[in-house]
Each structure stands twice: as C-alpha cells, then as structure tokens.
C-alpha cells in the first residue's frame, strides 16, 4: 500500500525526522480563507512517480499566486490521477540534496539501505552515470541496527563532519519506521541540508506491506480506506498493455512475453482459479480504468477456470468498449465452447501465448 506524501511525513514527524512546515488543502476548501505571506511549494498528492516533471509541483510567493496555482492543480490530472489534495510547504533555502532509501533486496533476502550524495534526481540515473556516489548496506535483521551503522554509511559517503550526526540520525529513524511499520519501501529524495545547516525530508515515499495490515491500524490511511475489495490479485504498473491470467506463474510469464516484445505491462491481474464470467468482467473493467491501457492480453489455462465463462465475460465487456485491442489465448476446460463464443463475436484467439502476444502488439 502506497501512502501519500503528507501521510508519510506525518509518520516521519512522529519518529523525529524533520520535515518542512506545511498544511493540507482539499478541493472543497475555501482558498480565499487561507493566508499565504511567504514562499511556498504546492505539491499535488497523487500516488505516481515523476510528479514534478508532470507539473504536479508548483510555487507561489503570495496569496494571489497561491490561489491561482492551487486552482491550476485541482483542475488538472497528474499522470492520469485527479488532484484532490495539495500539500503546501514552506520553501526551504536548500544548500545540498542527498538521497536515502530502504528497500527489500529480494536477491539477498535482506533490507537494503541506499544512500547517495546525488539527491533530487532519479537514483537509477545516478547509478548509471555516477555509481561511485551510491553507498549500499545490507541489514542483518537478526541483529540490532545500531546508530553507529548509520554513521558508518554517512562517513563512507564522505559527508562533512558537521552533517554526519544529523544525516545518520535520519537513516537510523528511517530504518525504525521501515521495521516497526512493516514497510516494503521508504525513501527520502531529496534529503536536504539548508543554508543554516539543518536537515529536512523534503519529500517522502512510504509503501506498507498489505499482508501486515492485521498488525497495524491502516484505517487512517487514504488508500486503505478507498481500497476496493477485489476478487482477484491486481497490481497497477507503468506500461500500456494490461495482462490478465489465471495463476501467478502464468500471469508473470505473460508479462515476460509483453516485455520481450518491446512493450511494458500496465498491470498484473490474476483472476485465480474458478473465476466466472462476472469476475472476468470485473477484471476487464478494472484494467480499463487505467487510461494508459492500449491493449489487453488475456492468457487462460483452464482447469477449474472454465474457458466458456472467461469468453462470456470478455464478450460482455467488449460490447461496452468495442475499440479496445484484445488478444486471447485459451486452453483447457470447455475450450471449444469458449472458442465458439469468441468466434461468434469476432474475437480472435490463439492456443500459443507467444503468438497471441505478438498479434496484440502488432495492433498497437
């Protein structure tokens, strides 16, 4: 579960990580009643990356500018997401920008701290151009993470002595958040040093493990409250080809096919075993909510999932969205009946998933 920036920063504050002074503005608020008498940053609260480049961060120096910029944000979409809330922060006098994150390294099966003196830019870009500016440290979860480890990381990055204690303290507290809240990712980019020598988390990214919800009170978070109770596993991604399968392995293999054909999956959607026509309809409608989707790759190996039920669901949704590009690969239980249903409605199908993927990409 992804948290909005303002939610993540509220948690940072509770753990003693400095954040800029701020207030939250909602679409329903009366902007004229808000007094702004200094330079501020208006940050659209949307759960997408690259918000700044997409026009989701604006600046204002007085009330008139603030109202104008806030209205501009509320009336636009940032990478397909409507802006319902804006975090308004004091504009910091930034001297330096650093990067710090903690993620799960699935190869090493350990949490990984990543620190760089190159903040404010994509860490992938730094890794490609200046890999020597990235410090990595794998955490042994069987041992306590002590403050001296955070200091070692910062010293390895060759920070000035007057910054070591402050930055190390942020890293130490960041891992405390990561561990205590069952996070899968926590990131500050940039972690800034101001001209008066103070340190602030100028941005905040925090992803929590949905499977740990029973241990925490997630009800306070916006995405959890709004989360649909879907009868299938769904993860939205950055591509433009929706991938639907039955079974995690088959769905992942289908995503690999799309990647190998030069496109990126727009989602992972596993309808599971025994899905009926209604579940298939829900799945298709869900992926079509994503405005980036240009085509849908459906890969079904029927066991307890019946191909005729899948076909019925596809036909119903295609009536609602006749211009959507589909590719269907179906094999297994009631395969012949399912194929007949698709044929009657002019929907092509394949028995080879590679061929189905290739034909879909050719249409896009």
UniProtKB/Swiss-Prot annotation:
Pathway: Carbohydrate metabolism; tricarboxylic acid cycle; succinate from succinyl-CoA (ligase route): step 1/1. Its EC number is 6.2.1.5. It catalyses: succinate + ATP + CoA = succinyl-CoA + ADP + phosphate; GTP + succinate + CoA = succinyl-CoA + GDP + phosphate. Signal peptide: none annotated. Its cofactor is Mg(2+). Coiled coil: none annotated. Mg(2+) binds at residues 189, 203. ATP binds at residues 43, 50-52, 89, 92, 97. One of its GO terms (cellular component) is succinate-CoA ligase complex. PROSITE patterns: ATP_GRASP (PS50975), SUCCINYL_COA_LIG_3 (PS01217). Binds 1 Mg(2+) ion per subunit. It comes from the Archaea. Substrate binds at residues 246, 303-305. Succinyl-CoA synthetase functions in the citric acid cycle (TCA), coupling the hydrolysis of succinyl-CoA to the synthesis of either ATP or GTP and thus represents the only step of substrate-level phosphorylation in the TCA. The beta subunit provides nucleotide specificity of the enzyme and binds the substrate succinate, while the binding sites for coenzyme A and phosphate are found in the alpha subunit. Belongs to the succinate/malate CoA ligase beta subunit family. Heterotetramer of two alpha and two beta subunits. PANTHER family: SUCCINATE--COA LIGASE [GDP-FORMING] SUBUNIT BETA, MITOCHONDRIAL, SUCCINYL-COA SYNTHETASE BETA CHAIN. This is Succinate--CoA ligase [ADP-forming] subunit beta. The gene is sucC.
